[in-house]
UniProtKB/Swiss-Prot annotation:
It catalyses: a UDP-3-O-[(3R)-3-hydroxyacyl]-alpha-D-glucosamine + a (3R)-hydroxyacyl-[ACP] = a UDP-2-N,3-O-bis[(3R)-3-hydroxyacyl]-alpha-D-glucosamine + holo-[ACP] + H(+). It is an enzyme of class 2 (transferase). Homotrimer. The active site is at H241. GO terms for biological process: lipid A biosynthetic process. It comes from the Bacteria. The keyword rRNA-binding does not apply. Catalyzes the N-acylation of UDP-3-O-acylglucosamine using 3-hydroxyacyl-ACP as the acyl donor. Is involved in the biosynthesis of lipid A, a phosphorylated glycolipid that anchors the lipopolysaccharide to the outer membrane of the cell. Belongs to the transferase hexapeptide repeat family. LpxD subfamily. Signal peptide: none annotated. One of its GO terms (molecular function) is N-acyltransferase activity. This is UDP-3-O-acylglucosamine N-acyltransferase.
Amino acid sequence: MQGYSLLELAQQIGATIRGNADVIVTDIAPLDKADNNQLTFISNPKFREHLLQSQAGALIVTESDIEFCSAQSNLLVVKDPYVAYAILAQYMDSTPKAAQGIHQSAVVSDTATLGQHVSIGANAVIEDGVILGDNVVIGAGCFIGKHVQIGENTQLWANVNIYHDVKIGSDCLIQSGAVIGSDGFGYANDRGRWIKIPQTGTVIIGNHVEIGACTCIDRGALDATVIEDNVIIDNLCQIAHNVHIGTGTAVAGGVIMAGSLKVGRYCLIGGASVINGHMEICDKVTITGMGMVMRPITEPGIYSSGIPLQPNKVWRKTAALTLDIDKINKRLKAVEKKLAE
């Protein structure tokens, strides 16, 4: 296992060193479990009580955390330990690539264009007219349809399916089982008979985008479904046709977005939320978990819906009252009218 000196790590995050700059750590571990060969961090002051007992070889802390540490501790002092942790986790990352080189069982069209140092895993299929940028990694069993373009340094884990004409930017990460560019849910109804509408648009994904396992992003009906730069989408999400997600937005697991929804920049969408289509959500909106969004949101802020978990007996009473809310409202108005007389 590779070792890293405190000096080397400090240079990556612009940290001030307190202690031995030559100490070597091999990886990162939780505060309460790190040993003297490991680096740890504290991102919340409520955990300061654990600093004195920490056995870590080095700690990432803020200036205000120092007084809670042992005098013998080796410290990397920064403004934001969590951001520093994220940067160092990338720097020290030992996750293997999804593929190394081009496997002999991969099927690559003669008309595909491959950049330098492209890797393609076993049984992957690269169809006609595909363009793969430098250092692209295509995992085992992936399908890359006709005329797909994938930018440099993007990695697809095993069994990702990218349909024809999709464009994916650089430095993206797509987890296993994701499907990008499948047909949107477009049909016309002729007296009870469904007529399928061919989805002739595409999907355009920007740079530095991450897409979670088994997430589906449908192609547009006529125009493109668009995911802008620096968007992160968790597992098991459904992004319908012609959705547009703005820069810097984060989408947690299990979210469903209906067609032609426009989500602004720097939004946070909580897990299992369901959002109606053909409307807009403005920039810097937070929707808490299991939110049901039926109308446009025009003001930045935090929005919630749904009933938090209750004991079953309490919930049943609440549900019963909800069914009678119209009757209760009429009785209340009648009482108010009498009192006003």
